[in-house]
Amino acid sequence: MKTPFLRVKNVVSVSALCAASLIYATSGYADDQRHDDENSDRPITVAVTGDWPYNKLLLDNAHLLVDSVNADTAVSRLIHVGDIHAGSMPCTSADILPPIPQSNPGYNQKIYYQFQQFAKPVIYTPGDNEWTDCQKTKQFKSGAPLNELASVRSQFFAKPGLTLGKETEVLSQSRHFDPTYPTDAQFVENVMWKQGKVVFATLNVPGSNNDTLPWAGTFANQTAQDKEVSERTGADLRWLEAAFKKAKKEHARAVVIGIQADMWDPAAITATSNELSNYTPIVQKLADLVEDFGGPVLLLNGDSHVYGADQPLTNSSSATGSIHHTQAVPNLTRITVQGSTTAPAEWLRLTIDPRKLQPFSWENVAYCADPAISCE
């Protein structure tokens, strides 16, 4: 009998990623170190995944990921950065009767069931494949974007302020929003929490150029799409500000942000088009907040399917630094998690040690040899 495929690789730290460029510490950040609480300075370990499950094989073998994460007693939570099925798989035809023939009405319930098998709190932020892109031909025109987003919210966020998996309290924007912007209350999926000296937040930032690629066919509705993008992006920016405000107020030593979109995906820029342009307001706001915070910040994303780690804003004239026209921000690190059917299928084991100047270290844990062929 073959043993389950499990291996650990790519043990990485920020200092290994870039030794000298991240030696920074503003006076405000240094002052925060005087507020250390011995009981809350312990290292924090979380699991991160995304673009999962991306095919029938991964769904049928979901227990491999669940069991691998559950077996790690150090892991305190799981963060899923969106896309619960492939971009070539159908959506649910939510609120459309009779259902679109090529749709899969019960799919989200299957994923919800798998999330509930984790013995850890599960924090999930939606990806474009489960709502934004449902109107595309490659997804069989199997759902209206806003209907699908509403369905995702009703399935995965039915209890605002509570995680999936092992129920644990988090702050949801639906309950903690600026009353000046009442439409922010709809974003139940944007959540925030603090563990020890680390503030975490998730934002609904999908692919498809932040949902600005035109909805097609019978689902075309430019007015509704523009309203969606405007309200969600505004809410995201305010939630991002709230996360850093919380981090400074509570003397956090690090901040971790989770989104779906790869806002620096080189494949999205060609000689004739720039499908990253509508992330610029988010990246510029992030750059300003990270610079002001002064401490280490980690951005987690999926979307482009292949593991990678970089510091995208360290050099404002570099390939990544020049895309969104920000100042140089050396204290931002970014990790793209392995996903889709990229072999091997892996989850990211992230450890944050607030006692260290460079607190982030991580390793990839493989649980399926080749998700396009076989997990054995």
Model region roles, listed by residue range:
Residues N55-K56, A86-M89, P126-Q135, S208-L213, ...:
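Active-site environment of divalent metal-dependent phosphoester hydrolases
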Residues N39, S68-R77, K194, A201, ...:
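His/acidic metal-ligating clusters that form di-metal
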Residues V48-G50, R77-D83, P121-G127, G258-I259, ...:
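Active-site neighborhood of phospho(di)ester-bond hydrolases with catalytic His/Asp-centered motifs
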Residues K2-S15:
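Bacterial N-terminal signal peptides that target proteins for export
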Residues W347-E376:
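A short C-terminal boundary segment appended to hydrolase-like catalytic domains
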Residues D31-N104, A252:
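N-terminal active-site segment of His-dependent metallophosphoesterases
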